[in-house]
From Swiss-Prot, chain B:
This is Trafficking protein particle complex subunit 2-like protein. Coiled coil: none annotated. Keywords: Cytoplasm, Endoplasmic reticulum, ER-Golgi transport, Golgi apparatus, Transport. One of its GO terms (biological process) is endoplasmic reticulum to Golgi vesicle-mediated transport. Belongs to the TRAPP small subunits family. Sedlin subfamily. It comes from Taeniopygia guttata. GO terms for cellular component: endoplasmic reticulum; Golgi apparatus; perinuclear region of cytoplasm. It is found in: Cytoplasm, Perinuclear region; Endoplasmic reticulum; Golgi apparatus. May play a role in vesicular transport from endoplasmic reticulum to Golgi. It comes from the Eukaryota. InterPro entries: Longin-like_dom_sf, Sedlin, TRAPPC2L. The gene is TRAPPC2L.
Length: 167, 139
């Protein structure tokens, strides 16, 4: 798919949301929600196409996300850094973010998290493989930072949907 | 290199105009305004068939005592006008051409910014920086 078309489509989506909602927080929430809905579907496609098995720890999950998932869907490979000592938190550093190719944030949208959809996607996808995570942007090139950084924090394994009596 | 750079919409109202701060700004507004007639003339002088395959760069529109005015028109009829000091003889046609090309690319990027509504005045840091870099090189 043509990358300009993709970027412009996402741009149109975000600006429409900005028109529909009065403040940026609502837009951020809405983007996250849409991302979540994409994530819960996308994970099926991802598992079917990539043939990766179950991850044994969070570090492996991080690798799969950065090296396979991002590569497959966005054509970029973010680097993984800033592991917390407990190994339950890391950062994805995006050198360039294809979603923001032409974008310049206007001054009246200073709190808008333009690419917040990505957070929702990651959260939704990992939830479907029994991982509750917290995902948020901590740096963004749109806001003048030199790189875009997504922070992911492992919260817990979701085990409640195992049918009783099994295992 | 340039002392004034302007972007004019299809309907001939300014989208962006910027000149070196040391000089009288209004004078450049007049110069650019006057040049629009020459642009129209140049386009209409070409036959209908030629308009479709013409070059975007129009070349020197007209020289005045102190300045030279160059023009460039995109296929969507957006006009770029550049005023250059005539004492600056080092500037070749080719360089002007490549400056216009740069300007055009930059303008395209702005159009692709989802927060920019086509037809509005251009307020963009990236565009400002680019235009500044073109005006700096003279001094």
């Amino acid at each position: 798919m043509n990358s300009e078309l993709f970027t412009l489509t996402y741009g149109a989506l975000v600006t429409q949301l900005c028109k529909d909602y009065e403040n940026d927080d609502d837009v951020n929430k809405q983007l996250d929600k849409m991302g979540y809905n994409i994530g819960v579907r996308l994970i099926e496609d991802f598992l079917a196409r990539s043939n990766v098995g179950r991850c044994h720890d969070f570090r492996e999950t991080a690798d799969v996300i950065a090296k396979i998932a991002f590569k497959m869907y966005l054509g970029i490979t973010p680097s993984i850094t800033n592991w917390s000592p407990g190994g339950d938190e890391f950062s994805l550093i995006l050198e360039n973010n294809p979603l923001v190719d032409f974008v310049e944030l206007p001054d009246n949208h200073s709190t808008l998290i333009y690419s917040n959809l990505l957070c929702g996607v990651l959260r939704g996808a990992l939830e479907m493989v029994q991982m509750a995570v917290d995902v948020k942007f901590v740096q963004d090139t749109l806001k003048g930072d030199s790189v875009t950084e997504i922070r992911m924090k492992f919260i817990r394994r979701i085990e409640d949907n195992l049918p009783a009596g099994e295992e | 290199m340039a002392v004034c750079i302007a972007v004019i919409a299809k309907e001939n109202y300014p989208l962006y105009i910027r000149s070196v701060p040391t000089e009288n700004e209004l004078k450049f507004h007049y110069t650019v305004h006057t040049s629009l007639d020459v642009v129209d003339e140049k386009i209409s002088a070409m036959g209908k068939a030629l308009v479709d395959q013409r070059e975007l760069y129009l070349g020197l529109l007209y020289p005045t005592e102190d300045y030279k005015v160059y023009g460039y028109v995109t296929n969507s009829k957006v006009k770029f006008v550049m005023v250059v000091d005539s004492s600056n003889t080092a500037l070749r046609d080719n360089e002007i051409r490549s400056m216009f090309r740069k300007l055009h690319n930059s303008y395209t990027d702005i159009m692709c910014n989802p927060f920019y509504n086509p037809g509005d005045r251009i307020h963009s840091r990236a565009f400002d920086t680019m235009v500044n870099s073109m005006m700096m090189q003279v001094c």
